[in-house]
Amino acid sequence: MRNLDFIDSFIPTEGKYIRVMDFYNSEYPFCIHAPSAPNGDIMTEICSRENNQYFIFFPTDDGRVIIANRHNGSVFTGEATSVVSDIYTGSPLQFFREFKRTMSTYYLAIQNPESATDVRALEPNSHELPSRLYFTNNIENNSNILISNKEQIYLTLPSLPENEQYPKTPVLSGIDDIGPNQSEKSIIGSTLIPCIMVSDFISLGERMKTTPYYYVKHTQYWQSMWSALFPPGSKETKTEKSGITDTSQISMTDGINVSIGADFGLKFGNKTFGIKGGFTYDTKTQITNTSQLLIETTYTREYTNTENFPVRYTGYVLASEFTLHRSDGTQVNTIPWVALNDNYTTIARYPHFASEPLLGNTKIITDDQN
């Protein structure tokens, strides 16, 4: 797995809940205000609910962070003049950069480091509590923009499974052996994914406390398409499938905000766009280069046995399987998301010294999302 730690030691890693403090009023933490507060204000005040005071800084590919509250999973969100707490959508206004000011303090900005978040009282020019987050262009000598990380609660990250060798092609043991329906599965890669980016029946607030990070596992295996005993010189037409079913494509998009492109690369939605580089690196996949989604295709192919003796042939296609898991390893999607890639096919045969069948005409039967 790639290293997600931040460079500066005072900036948190993905493995902690952080209690963020106003540097000016250092005794008072940032706190998600009561639901009755307008616009989900982030306040600096005396906060009675402990979970409202702790945040996870979820890192993204480019070093920005998504700051999520431990109580309900709401995230820091920029508005016209202030920063509030809102549900995560992947909006650019929910990605913050951290700029170091001293060894123990920093300030937050969305894009422009000259426009920082500013901790100010509800009444201008006052340091009375409660106060809230605004944007300001006043950076120099402005202690109101400074924040620091005080208390930390460490969390246990999911243990990712070890990667394995690519799956071996099945070997037939006799003329009547049709081979396994699936070869042994091999884990190709796994990656962490923040709980705010996935879909689960567990409430977001509960996820933030029990499984703030999920993981996605990418597995590959050889899937049998057909098997037949070819008499000497015979020709047969076989039906094969490629791609992914519409049901699986929709379920995968709903589950992890990732879909599979027509070139078998991954397409990322707004929620996961910020982690697409790390996601594909860890799972040993690629980002799609097309706007078209992969669909299921059924086609027929003609095969001819060119030998002067009977041969058993079994056709296989490479399957890529994706599963979503909670931090304790339990699988969320009970039916895995599987794509069959007909760019990678193989034909097992017996006797082993027999040549592969001669490939003839190929005809697409269906090419739709049914």
From Swiss-Prot:
UniProt remark on domains: Has an N-terminal beta-trefoil domain and a C-terminal pore-forming domain. The trefoil domain has barrel and cap subdomains; the cap has 3 carbohydrate-binding modules while the barrel is involved in host cell receptor binding. At neutral pH the carbohydrate-binding modules are accessible on the toxin surface but the barrel subdomain is not.
Protein role: Component of a binary toxin active against Culex and some Aedes mosquito larvae. The individual subunits are not toxic. BinAB binds to the gastric caecum and posterior midgut of C.quinquefasciatus larvae; this subunit alone binds the entire larval gut. Binary toxin internalization into host gut cells requires both proteins. Toxic to Aedes atropalpus mosquito larvae; mortality towards both C.quinquefasciatus and A.atropalpus is maximal by 48 hours. A.aegypti is not very susceptible to this toxin.
Family: Belongs to the toxin_10 family.
Chain intervals for the UniProt region annotation (Beta-trefoil domain): 1-155
Propeptide: 1-6
Organism the protein comes from: Lysinibacillus sphaericus
Keywords from the named record: Disulfide bond, Sporulation, Toxin, Virulence
Assembly with partners or alone: Forms a heterodimer with BinB.
Record-given protein name: Binary larvicide subunit BinA
GO MF annotation terms: toxin activity
UniProt-annotated location(s): Spore, Perispore
Transmembrane segments: none
Region (Pore-forming domain): 156-370
GO process terms (BP): sporulation resulting in formation of a cellular spore
Keyword Transcription: no
Record PTM text: Processed by proteases in the mosquito gut, probably at both the N- and C-termini.
InterPro entries, A to Z: Ricin_B-like_lectins (IPR035992), Toxin_P42 (IPR008872)
Disulphide bond pairs: C31-C47
